[in-house]
């Protein structure tokens, strides 16, 4: 059946991809070489809530009644809240830009610092644990946000199980997180806060960085592409798809671009595994 109507519950995984803050790849995920940059998986995700704010309704009132109503976009911030069953010093340090230090056999992380407000921007992939279409067949629902800033909240010590919360600010971008440029001709919009992806296999995203030499770019060994036809590679700067060949039609692991990527060429691959 067509990928359209579905329902589901729970979270399978949340993956964060820190973004380049300067240079030609500013706003792209921080890949480093021809090996797949997989981002950082958030441990123990429990729930995620999006909030795009309520639309404004403005009535035309005269003679004691409403004659017409105009609905306009919300002026509230687009945000989210991620809750997890684990806390991670490494993840908190990554997001806030502070350092973990070792003192004796202990690790120490500063919190509530003078760097508040300087948290890094990430792309974010959020995947549902179980989704079925309207015929009961298994499928996958994934949200991909190109601009997300996560602020870790301190955990409380009570008789309840630990709950770690991250408050998230979401921003619009002119391209999807994998680099595809949004255009009126193709998407009928030029900016978006997130992409909602429906797929038969598990959707994934990885990044590669060219160096004028590397010609083979690899996927994670534990996450090969189900089929090469499910994989698309994008150049982040041009916003266009990259031509090339895969080493196999099923369980593909290696992509060879038609043209060897230049130094600092940021390639992003989206595929199903």
PLM-predicted stretches and their roles:
Residues 1-50:
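Polar/acidic, low-complexity leader/linker segments enriched in S/T/G and N/D
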Residues 58-93, 97, 159-175:
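Oligomerization/assembly interface segments of phage tail-like spikes and tubes
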Residues 60-68, 107-112, 157-158, 208-224, ...:
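Surface-exposed ligand/attachment interfaces on beta-rich extracellular proteins
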Residues 189-248, 254-255, 260-273:
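Extended beta-strand solenoid/passenger and fiber regions
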